[in-house]
Amino acid sequence: MGPAGGLTVSGDGLAFDLITMGRIGVDLYPLTTGVPLEEADTFGKFLGGSPANVAVAAARLGRRVALISRTGADPFGAYLRSELRGFGVDGRWVAEVADHPTPITFCEIFPPDRFPLYFYRLPKAPDLEIAAEELDLGAIREARVFWMTGTGLSEEPSRAATLAALEARTSPGTTVFDLDWRPMLWREKPGPYYERALALATVAVGNTEECAIATGESEPYAAARALLAAGVELAVVKRGPEGVLAVHRDGTVAEVPPVPVQVVNGLGAGDAFGGALCHGLLAGWDLATVVRYANAAGAIVASRLACASAMPFSDEVEEVVGRAGGL
């Protein structure tokens, strides 16, 4: 059937474990840490964009994953599709947009906690050109987990497409809203769009700043309660050096401390956390186990330079979990 029709399976006839939707781009990082961009002269080129990284993270853990996004019709776009294939992520819904170049993101790396980002997404990023009528809503409906982001709500037609995808999630399954607040990418107040998405999602994930944007609450427990009141079943609040708080509507609470690690680049840690969170939810683990596992995955990536290529395999995560006291 057509793009919005009934193709609900992956290549071997099974529904996807996870479909992510939203940003993809090229990350260019200085190969020397602690150096400002004006002094850096060697850079590494990596696949980037939070939904793309989350997809890679889950694929590394053995999950059947696809990404919905757009690139420019340029060599960087070809590079990204090649990288997705190499990482085991199905890129059938990563199409080219002729009129917009593939986005580039530069980063400065000042461990342990300063990693300024510089987005080059003008005049408009291709991933914001995803249109509702282009979506394979059948596949989105059948995926065991669907992951979308706040940036996808920032501009049309991506906004309408993201909401259409959320509304298609009528079958049992997990729908994750990554709050993903990037103020430089918004021209409007996000409140009404975040409110609509929270009413349609089952899980919300964000750091304390993102939770405050979504709910008006910055205290972690208050933010979690506000997210639950907005409609989700599970609220996950990332608290940086204080660890992670997860609260389920059924009253289950998991408060997990951080995994000690020597930070090299913290930018991919949240995406590794997200992919591992999806993996744990798919596995049916209890909430504390899911969060401990996701925390370990995030810590591993924080100790490495890159994002996508730094995503850990399951044996690496299990080793870190074991050192931290086990699941």
Model-predicted regions and their roles:
Residues 1-90, 113, 262, 327:
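Glycine-rich phosphate/adenosyl-contacting loop at the front of the ribokinase-like
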Residues 1-19, 216-327:
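Conserved phosphate-binding/catalytic region of the ribokinase-like
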Residues 13, 137-141, 197-199:
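A short, aliphatic-rich alpha-helical micro-motif
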Residues 64-65, 91, 173-175, 235:
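Hydrophobic anchor at the start of a short beta-strand
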Residues 145-226, 234, 242-244:
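Conserved beta-alpha-beta core of the PfkB/ribokinase-like small-molecule kinase fold
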